[in-house]
């Protein structure tokens, strides 16, 4: 008669238990890499949202004509007029 491997059922782990990550939260946190050069440390503080805001405003202004925002710079408007002629 052939023998099968035993079926081992694991006990369900208690959901209230504390894991290693919960004990030491500093290890689980993402790494904050700091540049060693003093001249580059200010770059970490910069937010890159200004160009995104500008492009969004420009897009909205070009789609809606009655806004007080410009549709672009003067040079861009002149190029558009030349291309349309």
Swiss-Prot record:
<keyword id="KW-0539">Nucleus</keyword>
<feature type="compositionally biased region" description="Basic residues">
    <location>
        <begin position="35"/>
        <end position="48"/>
    </location>
</feature>
<dbReference type="InterPro" id="IPR019034">
    <property type="entry name" value="UPF0390"/>
</dbReference>
<dbReference type="Pfam" id="PF09495">
    <property type="entry name" value="DUF2462"/>
</dbReference>
<dbReference type="GO" id="GO:0005634">
    <property type="term" value="C:nucleus"/>
</dbReference>
<feature type="region of interest" description="Disordered">
    <location>
        <begin position="1"/>
        <end position="28"/>
    </location>
</feature>
<feature type="region of interest" description="Disordered">
    <location>
        <begin position="35"/>
        <end position="54"/>
    </location>
</feature>
<protein>
    <recommendedName>
        <fullName>Uncharacterized protein YLR363W-A</fullName>
    </recommendedName>
</protein>
């Amino acid at each position: 008669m052939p023998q099968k491997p035993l079926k081992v059922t694991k006990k369900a782990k208690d959901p209230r238990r504390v894991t290693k990550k919960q004990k030491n939260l500093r290890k689980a946190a993402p790494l904050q890499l700091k540049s060693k050069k003093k001249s580059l440390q200010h770059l970490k503080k910069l937010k890159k949202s200004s160009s995104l805001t500008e492009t969004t405003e420009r897009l909205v202004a070009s789609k809606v004509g009655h806004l007080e925002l410009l549709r672009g710079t003067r040079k861009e408007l002149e190029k558009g007029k030349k291309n349309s002629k």
